[in-house]
Curated annotation (Swiss-Prot):
Modified residues ((3R,4S)-4-hydroxyisoleucine): 11
The organism's place on the tree of life at top rank: Eukaryota
UniProt modification remark: Processed by the macrocyclase-peptidase enzyme POPB to yield a toxic bicyclic octapeptide. POPB first removes 10 residues from the N-terminus. Conformational trapping of the remaining peptide forces the enzyme to release this intermediate rather than proceed to macrocyclization. The enzyme rebinds the remaining peptide in a different conformation and catalyzes macrocyclization of the N-terminal 8 residues.
Function, as annotated: Major toxin belonging to the bicyclic octapeptides amatoxins that acts by binding non-competitively to RNA polymerase II and greatly slowing the elongation of transcripts from target promoters.
UniProt propeptide residues: 1-10, 19-35
Modified residues ((3R,4R)-4,5-dihydroxyisoleucine): 11
More info: The typical symptoms of amatoxin poisoning are gastro-intestinal distress beginning 6-12 hours after ingestion, a remission phase lasting 12-24 hours, and progressive loss of liver function culminating in death within 3-5 days. One of the few effective treatments is liver transplantation.
Gene that encodes the chain: AMA1-1
4-hydroxyproline modification, residue list: 18
Name of the molecule in the record: Alpha-amanitin proprotein 1
Keywords: Hydroxylation, Thioether bond, Toxin
Keyword Translocase: no
Phylogenetic classification of the source organism: Eukaryota, Fungi, Dikarya, Basidiomycota, Agaricomycotina
Cyclopeptide (Ile-Pro) crosslink location in chain: 11-18
Cross-link entry 2'-cysteinyl-6'-hydroxytryptophan sulfoxide (Trp-Cys), positions: 12-16
Amino acid sequence: MFDTNATRLPIWGIGCNPWTAEHVDQTLASGNDIC
């Protein structure tokens, strides 16, 4: 869904830690907020 390098960038908002692509996929799949 996302490019691996792109997902590691802090594109999720200020104050959020950089996530790995795997974590982002799991978070989006579970429907939880990333921040």
